[in-house]
Amino acid sequence: MKTGTIVKVSGPLVVAEGMRDANMFDVVRVSDKHLIGEIIEMHGDKASIQVYEETSGLGPGEEVVSLGMPMSVELGPGLISTIYDGIQRPLEKMYDISGTNITKGVEVSSLDRTTKWEFKPKKSVGDKVVAGDIIGGVQETAVVECKIMVPYGVKGTIKEIYSGEFTVEDTVCVITDEKGNDIPVTMMQKWPVRKERPYREKKTPDSLLVTGQRVIDTFFPITKGGVAAIPGPFGSGKTVTQHQLAKWADADIVVYIGCGERGNEMTDVLLEFPELKDPRTGESLMQRTVLIANTSDMPVAAREASIYTGITIAEYFRDMGYSVALMADSTSRWAEALREMSGRLEEMPGEEGYPAYLGSRLAQFYERAGKVNCLGMDEREGTLTAIGAVSPPGGDTSEPVSQATLRIVKVFWGLDASLAYKRHFPAINWLTSYSLYQEKVDVWADKNVNDNFSAQRAQAMKLLQVESELQEIVQLVGVDSLSDGDRLILEVTRSIREDFLHQNSFHEVDTYTSLHKQYRMMGLILKFYKSAQDAIKQNVTINDIIKLSVLEKIGRAKYVEEGDIDAAYDSIEDEIDNELADLIKKRGAEEL
């Protein structure tokens, strides 16, 4: 262990001398309180340390000890449904030790050392294995099997493998490597958080991550293994959108990072998720979720660690072959922590005081997402989808964090304050948002949902763009100056906005919409548009069309339960035909 002495304390930054033998990113223990820190800069024998706990009471002359290893997380059975702080300390255990206010220097194992897990081997003695091969599994929850993998850098033949109940530190397998050395394998691995976990090959993401949110799945989709940003001003619904994605996305594992946001938002997750049922498995959502809470009142430096901790845990499950979704709320708070540390290190500031390396740090985080061929001899694919909220002051997306994020991500869900104030949620602006995965998803949706899915989406998007042009004319000269055809477009796009894009996250049916239901809903609106166009050509007036009772039924169609969709929607389609046919007959009789 390398020992030094504190010479300066500046908030979360501590400078210690006598640290010549230490390394960059080594974990250190600061003072006799054993505060956790990490070396982030070296000058000769002086080390600058960012401390992940409250530094009040520290002073020059106190001891600093380098542990000689980087900041790492423990990976193994016991991660699912646990809530951690930013440096992977389980908050429930910390509460048992120190109560509601976390005391300094608390040391708690990330994974419980006493819990015994039922290990079932999947390999036999004499089998040849390489790094990443699955040697066995532990049924951690009803929906997640924690697959035990050969650690990175290990290759050889299985000499012994056991079955039964073990703790995470017990040896479950012994592998003889090519030099004849026996290597014991436990169910737990340690991995440095700043280092990307290896894989065999990165692939192009091409299948849709179904979120159940209509504006996302139909108009601005994200793939499994994609990256997305949700920028928006305060109160526009970033956190609720993140919660909706965490609840209903068809990922196998969800890692939710609350980075510098309100504590109440993490409380909502803890209260809601155990009560909600996953639409695919019927089990509690908590049984597939890992939570990392680093709320706004916790030490600023730990915000940076929380992002890396979360994505390393997500990569671990990706390596098992799972589809993982990671929510980071919010990356702006992480960037603010970088700015604070950069200022205390007296580095040259970049734009708006953020450090010059802001863009590269964001890229390092988002580039760890993707679809990969995992390590190991068997062919298995894993995906890691990263969705980051951005909180630009005043909703101004020209600020550095938003701009650096938009250069990296391929999906932009721009939240709009004016929509939020109109109570239109999700408040995703359909004119400014975009998805660069659209072409890949169109191919996937046409194959897996309906071969007309992408054509319907394109037609609806075109109508919404035409509406924005017509709105300018309406504001100048009024709606009566428009032709019946243009007024029909305004009526149909109102239906798309209010009946399709608007979604109530607190309604038990409307909160989640399957792809089939989304296709049928949009089909209803576009069928009405086509049939009404034909009626207008036969001299039916727009005033008669907008009084039809079927419009209300189209509006209420989103509350039809999944099992009744086809029968209910077929009935509404018949009503559209019948009511418009009656209008045409009536108009024909009047003309006679």
From Swiss-Prot:
Q: What is a biological process (GO) this protein takes part in?
A: proton motive force-driven plasma membrane ATP synthesis
Q: Which reaction does it catalyse?
A: ATP + H2O + 4 H(+)(in) = ADP + phosphate + 5 H(+)(out)
Which stretch is the leader sequence? none
Residues given in the record as ATP binding sites: 232-239
Q: Which residue spans adopt a coiled-coil conformation according to this UniProt entry?
A: none
Q: Which UniProt keywords apply?
A: ATP synthesis, ATP-binding, Hydrogen ion transport, Ion transport, Nucleotide-binding, Translocase, Transport
Give the family from UniProt. Belongs to the ATPase alpha/beta chains family.
Q: Which NCBIfam families match?
A: PRK04192.1 (NF003220)
What is this protein's name? V-type ATP synthase alpha chain
Which gene is the coding source of this polypeptide chain?
A: atpA
